[in-house]
């Protein structure tokens, strides 16, 4: 039987996931993180993107995170997300429209702050589309 640990994914609105998992993948402030059982304690910021949850028996779930904090402790991991949305709850048409608007905003941006904001919005839209794509494949 595969080793597991307890994972909680919570946002300000609700608890998104609570249960035993084999591993997770998430984007931290320093890059991609793979958290397996026995991982060293860690506290890091999470960048906007997705969390890939591999539950017991290899079943996968994908959740979009707008950012937050990841805490790894012996035997448990907690994700405190600013906003968290399950892949099946994301609206593909809205994500595509947000991507299009962000790309237009980048083209017409004036100044570093404007460009940085548009780039962040584009990254969020692309992350949502990726979560939608992976959720469809996992079903």
UniProtKB/Swiss-Prot annotation:
Subcellular location: Cell inner membrane
One Gene Ontology CC term in the entry: proton-transporting ATP synthase complex
A Gene Ontology biological process term: proton motive force-driven ATP synthesis
Similarity comment: Belongs to the ATPase epsilon chain family.
Its job: Produces ATP from ADP in the presence of a proton gradient across the membrane.
NCBIfam families: ATP_synt_epsi (TIGR01216), PRK00571.1-4 (NF001847)
Assembly behavior: F-type ATPases have 2 components, CF(1) - the catalytic core - and CF(0) - the membrane proton channel. CF(1) has five subunits: alpha(3), beta(3), gamma(1), delta(1), epsilon(1). CF(0) has three main subunits: a, b and c.
HAMAP family the record matches: ATP_synth_epsil_bac (MF_00530)
Protein name as it appears in the record: ATP synthase epsilon chain
Organism: Salmonella typhimurium (strain LT2 / SGSC1412 / ATCC 700720)
Gene this protein is translated from: atpC
